[in-house]
Amino acid sequence: MTTFEKVQGMIAEQLQVSAGSITEASRLVEDLKADSANVMVMILELETEFGIEVEDEVILNLKTVGDVVKYIDAHQ
């Protein structure tokens, strides 16, 4: 399973949307309707799943699913 597929599944579960509707270009807030609480929960789950730590200031720069995937791949 690729990083994208794992992230896609986690986001789909958290936001209760179809995994098929999530692409790397999907914007977390604008397209997927994530609010700040959703984003924080997703980040905590991603940190646990991938064994990484996401700094608070970085979270603001993670706008799309692709941004999240690239960050994880670069920090694993």
Explain the meaning of each model-derived region.
Residues 2-34, 38-43, 48-49, 53-76:
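Phosphopantetheine-dependent thiolation modules in NRPS/PKS and related acyl-activating systems
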